[in-house]
Regions:
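Hydrophobic anchor at the beta1->P-loop junction of P-loop NTPases
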Residues: 7
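P-loop (Walker A) phosphate-binding loop of NTP-binding proteins
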Residues: 10
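Conserved glycine(s) of the Walker
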Residues: 14
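Hydrophobic positions on the alpha1 helix immediately C-terminal to the Walker A/P-loop
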Residues: 18
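Post-Walker A helix-loop "phosphate-sensing" segment adjacent to the P-loop in P-loop NTPases
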Residues: 24-31
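ATP-dependent small-molecule kinase phosphotransfer cores
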Residues: 31-90, 103-107, 111-118, 124, ...
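Small-molecule kinase domains that catalyze NTP-dependent phosphoryl transfer to phosphate-bearing small molecules
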Residues: 118-169
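C-terminal accessory "lid"/substrate-recognition subdomains
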Residues: 140, 158, 168-187
C-alpha cells in the first residue's frame, strides 16, 4: 500500500530532521522540494530569498516544482514529501505542519552550517531574511492558488517545535500518524 506524508512548516521548524527520522522509522523515501529549490537558486546564482523573490514574477518555476510534487503524490510508492504545498497537491496525504517561534527559527538556521547558500552574519540578519522569505512564499501561494498556508484547517496535525527536541517532535507525530496510516504502535 502506498502512503504519502506531507510535511510542511515554517522555516527552521525542524522539517528536515523530522523527515529523516520518519523515513528511518517507516522505511520511506523523502522528496524535498526545499532542496530542489535551493539547487535551482544556486544554479541561477541567487540566495534562497532572492530566488523566492524571483519566483514571484516567474510563476513557471513554482509550477515546475508544484507539478513535480503532484506527480510524486501519484506514484505507487510510499513517500514523505517535504514541501510547503504538498498538503494542497497531495490531498490524500497525512498533512503535518510544524510551527516555531521566529527568534528560535533564526537561531536554528544561523547555527546550521549545512545551509551553504543561506549564510548570514548574525541571528538578527537571519531573522530578517526568514521574515522576508515567509512573506514572499505566503504571497506567492495566495496569488497562485488562493490558499493560506498558515490556515490550521489545511492540516491533520500541527506541532509547535519551539521548545521541543527533535525526538520529542518525532514522538508527538508517531501516534496520530500510525493511527492515520492504519498501523498499530509496535507493528
Amino acid at each position: 500500500m502506498d502512503r504519502k506524508i506531507a510535511v510542511s512548516g515554517e522555516l527552521g521548524s525542524g522539517k528536515t530532521v523530522l523527515c529523516r527520522k520518519l523515513a528511518l522509522a517507516l522505511n520511506m523515501e523523502i522528496v524535498s522540494v526545499g532542496s530542489i529549490q535551493r539547487q535551482l537558486a544556486e544554479k541561477y546564482g541567487m540566495s534562497t530569498l532572492e530566488f523566492n523573490k524571483y519566483m514571484e514574477t516567474h510563476p513557471e518555476l513554482d509550477r515546475e516544482c508544484d507539478n513535480m510534487v503532484t506527480l510524486y503524490g501519484k506514484e505507487p510508492r510510499s513517500l514523505i514529501l517535504d514541501s510547503r504545498m504538498a498538503w494542497y497537491f497531495v490531498p490524500d496525504a497525512f498533512k503535518l505542519h510544524l510551527l516555531v517561534d521566529s527568534r528560535i527559527a533564526a537561531e536554528r538556521i544561523f547555527g546550521d552550517r549545512d545551509r551553504k547558500n543561506e549564510t548570514y552574519a548574525s541571528v538578527q540578519e537571519t531573522s530578517l531574511h526568514l521574515t522576508a522569505r515567509k512573506q514572499s512564499e505566503a504571497l506567492r501561494f495566495k496569488q497562485q492558488y488562493g490558499v493560506d498556508i498558515d490556515d490550521a484547517r489545511n492540516y491533520n496535525l500541527l506541532i509547535d517545535t519551539s521548545h521541543l527536541s527533535p525526538e520529542a517532535v518525532f514522538n508527538k507525530v508517531m501516534e496520530p500518524l500510525q493511527e492515520y496510516l492504519g498501523k498499530q504502535p509496535g507493528d
